[in-house]
Amino acid sequence: MYRALHPSLTIRQSDIHGLGIFAATDIPEYTILGISHVAEFKHHRYHCGYIRTPLGGFINHSNDPNCIKIKMNDDGSYSSLEGIVTSATMAIETIKEIIKNEELTVRYTIYSLGGE
């Protein structure tokens, strides 16, 4: 049976922005929480991608995230999600233990323009 969200997750109001993804239970480090899609959006002024699934659509940004985005390869393996991605299936994985009611976050920036 398809579930839009991992059973350990819920969507609710976020102090960061709008709605967010929260842990409904404690979640161990290195848990893959599900997939999200980055789809090509050619009609935008700046050729870019967007995420449109409950997991990808509601997870908020943090400079100190507790999750990372990893690319799902065609053979079912995973690899680092680096650079500008315009079409991919990605998974969200925890990089530290997450306690019940904690908001899950990822770093939106996958590249930097000057400076840091």
Describe the function of each predicted region.
Residues 1-116:
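Conserved catalytic SET/PR domain of SAM-dependent protein methyltransferases, capturing the structural core
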